[in-house]
């Protein structure tokens, strides 16, 4: 129905494709469905009904910066800011990065003369293709809470992290709207995608939109450039991880060698003490014979 070779060849976690799919005015209903799926943890409730894009265009200058993040930013009818992005490679800083994005978007709301009470909630959503947090749940949400009774300070901070690999490791059919979107983003097989499309018309719309993606040479060019960058980044991260592992092992071996050297030194010291003891005893025996 919707699934063809061009669809299966696409990496939906490519940030250029993600923004192309979800960052367009005519495909806003798709984005709203994905956002609501995250905010309601998969229920069918729609708490966000409108979304005004703050950056609708794919800026060519931004695209030239290989390390630029092609996120989607907008606000709801009540002024709530929402930022959503995908991350493929683990840079080991996603917690700091998302907190920085949140703080930047939150602080830039105020104009000169406005009150702090005019600040609106800011929501950041990060869909990650790697595991990061020490828990089995694939969806983590962070707010500002009181240390002992866990009462929220307010509702202005919401950081959502979706760890795709943790969901994939469950090896089950989607149980709700959020999991159907995760199946779509995780590039699963055609049969599963068609089932998800039949159950969610917005996923069907996304698959239909993909058919047109490769028809524009400019879009395909930037998609390929981002893919190359992601591959290079993955290769660099793998090399760094390997070097760090080797350094850690070398440090461990050096520590063990140092420990062994210390033990050998202590044994030598004990052996010398024993030798001195026997030498003294031998000299005493000689003196007694005299």
Residue ranges and their predicted role:
Residues 1-158, 168:
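Accessory alpha/beta interaction modules
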């Amino acid at each position: 129905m919707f699934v063809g070779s061009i669809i299966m060849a696409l990496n939906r976690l490519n940030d250029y494709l993600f923004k192309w799919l979800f960052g367009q005015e005519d495909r806003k209903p798709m984005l709203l469905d994905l956002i609501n799926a995250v905010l309601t943890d998969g229920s069918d409730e729609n708490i966000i009904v409108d979304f005004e894009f703050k950056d609708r265009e794919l800026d060519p200058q931004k695209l030239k910066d290989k390390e630029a993040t092609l996120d989607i930013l907008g606000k709801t009818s009540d002024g709530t800011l929402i930022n959503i992005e995908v991350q493929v490679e683990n840079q080991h800083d996603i917690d700091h990065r998302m907190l920085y994005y949140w703080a930047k978007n939150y602080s830039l709301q105020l104009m000169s003369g406005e009150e702090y009470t005019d600040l609106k909630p800011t929501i950041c959503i990060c869909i990650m293709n790697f595991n990061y947090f020490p828990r089995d749940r694939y969806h983590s949400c962070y707010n500002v809470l009181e240390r002992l009774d866990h009462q929220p300070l307010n509702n202005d901070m919401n950081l959502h992290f979706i760890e795709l690999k943790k969901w994939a490791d469950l090896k089950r059919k989607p149980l709700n709207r959020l999991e159907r979107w995760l199946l779509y983003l995780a590039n699963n097989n055609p049969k599963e995608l068609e089932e998800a499309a039949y159950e969610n018309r917005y996923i069907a719309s996304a698959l239909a939109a993909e058919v047109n993606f490769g028809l524009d040479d400019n879009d395909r060019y930037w998609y390929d450039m981002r893919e190359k960058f992601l591959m290079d980044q993955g290769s660099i991260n793998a090399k760094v991880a390997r070097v760090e592992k080797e350094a850690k092992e070398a440090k461990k071996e050096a520590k063990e060698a140092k420990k062994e050297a210390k033990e050998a030194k202590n044994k030598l010291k004990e052996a010398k003490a024993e030798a001195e003891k026997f030498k003294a005893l031998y000299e005493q025996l000689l003196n007694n014979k005299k």
